[in-house]
């Protein structure tokens, strides 16, 4: 079976009415438009998303009237920065922008993959951060407001 569109989000489904099969993906896999997956029941499915469709943690595909395939995302260690004020947010954004690392900004925190160079720069600039195990709802992404290139 090949799915071409996300039918719903698990949070919007009455899970008591369905048998749920789960696939756990890496956050990087959420960026893929074409992927082959194997559920926790051993069933294989293809996902070839139509234009405009995106995977996220909790994406759901209806297999039939009684079965749903749910997408989960594995946790990963990430650098988590909670800037103490707008000045630190600006400095941090400038530093991270220069590294061209994919990030996620959510709930006044900045998330990015663990990187020893970034850790060293944050430490040198005395910007507090932690390493936390996080499950991302969406993949980290590059902020590209323009076609900026070096």
Swiss-Prot record:
InterPro entries: UreE (IPR012406), UreE_C_dom (IPR007864), UreE_N (IPR004029), UreE_N_sf (IPR036118)
Pfam families in the record: UreE_C, UreE_N
Keyword Zinc: no
UniProt keyword annotations, A-Z: Chaperone, Cytoplasm, Nickel, Nickel insertion
GO MF annotations in UniProt: nickel cation binding; unfolded protein binding
GO cellular component, one term: cytoplasm
Cellular compartment(s): Cytoplasm
GO biological processes: protein folding; protein-containing complex assembly; urea metabolic process
Family: Belongs to the UreE family.
Function statement: Involved in urease metallocenter assembly. Binds nickel. Probably functions as a nickel donor during metallocenter assembly.
HAMAP family in the record: UreE
Official protein name in the record: Urease accessory protein UreE
Native species: Streptococcus thermophilus (strain ATCC BAA-250 / LMG 18311)
Lineage: Bacteria, Bacillati, Bacillota, Bacilli, Lactobacillales
